[in-house]
Curated annotation (Swiss-Prot):
Tissue expr: B-cells. Expressed in a number of B-cell lines including P32/ISH and Namalwa. Expressed in erythroleukemia cell and small cell lung carcinoma cell lines. Also expressed on the surface of T-cells.
Protein's name in the database: Signal transducer CD24
Species of provenance: Homo sapiens (Human)
Region of interest (Disordered), residue spans: 28-58
Disease: Multiple sclerosis: A multifactorial, inflammatory, demyelinating disease of the central nervous system. Sclerotic lesions are characterized by perivascular infiltration of monocytes and lymphocytes and appear as indurated areas in pathologic specimens (sclerosis in plaques). The pathological mechanism is regarded as an autoimmune attack of the myelin sheath, mediated by both cellular and humoral immunity. Clinical manifestations include visual loss, extra-ocular movement disorders, paresthesias, loss of sensation, weakness, dysarthria, spasticity, ataxia and bladder dysfunction.
One GO CC term, this protein: cell surface
Amino acid sequence: MGRAMVARLGLGLLLLALLLPTQIYSSETTTGTSSNSSQSTSNSGLAPNPTNATTKAAGGALQSTASLFVVSLSLLHLYS
């Protein structure tokens, strides 16, 4: 009974780790585009680079996914 509960907890954490970064990515890109549209046109020398924003969001999402995956594996190893 204990192993089944730990397995469910681990799978739940893994599912959360897979779904949470997509929500973080979508909220970061939404706020990034809204702040870019409100900028004045006087700063024409510096154009925003959407590639960097996407890379940073994907990197953060990957890091949080990897962290939660390691935590779930550690819990499974500890309680198995």
